[in-house]
Amino acid sequence: MKTLIITGASAGIGLATARRFADAGYAVTNISRRPCPLPSVNHLPGDLSNAGFLDTLGDRLSEALAGADAVSLIHNASRLLNDSAADTSSDQLRAVMEVNLAAPNTLNRFVIPRMPSGSSILYVGSTLAEKAVPNSFSYVVTKHALVGMMRATCQDLAGRGIHTACICPGFTDTEMLRAHVPEEAMDAVRGLSAYGRLIEPSEIADTLHWAAENPVINGAVLHANLGQVER
């Protein structure tokens, strides 16, 4: 059986992705503080902001990986703050890096040795992985670094039959977006898409599933943003 290990599948893109992979016959395990509401998903409670989050999960995660024909590891969970280069403390930056960068590295070190050929490691980036906007300093910094992590992963795993990619969603209708963008600004955000709408989480889930099944995109950054209008 194919196995999906995903972080942050309690809502938004993560939840839609867990559903998409489960529908495709994957055994799905989620790691997050809040449980994934899908009854078929194996939930491992973990706080990715805690550097030792795997200390209590290792045995159960090993069980989830045991006997898998192929493993897809999706680094979906992330933290987004309203902050800027002028006022973000190093402690605040480290806290965001713990979730957005260190946790993926921790999981990679654990999961990669247990991955058979035919597996994949997918990073959920953002349009802000290759550009910047004001007041999203730590998010922009860490998402840029996530692209570097993906590219380094690709090079380091060459010849092992494990492919990787970074999928960069545009403005997606998630709890995170609505918490970050005031309601009165949502029409303007929709206008930044060539289609004049927000992306549905299921559209990103479909993209992630396709990426997991197609190693030809190994090392690629895939923009999933409906054609973002530059202004």
Task: Show where each model-derived region lies.
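Active-site helix of classical SDR
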Residues: 108, 142-143, 150
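Residue(s) in the substrate-gating loop at a strand-loop-helix junction
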Residues: 126
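Alpha-helical segment proximal to the catalytic Tyr-Lys
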Residues: 113, 155-156
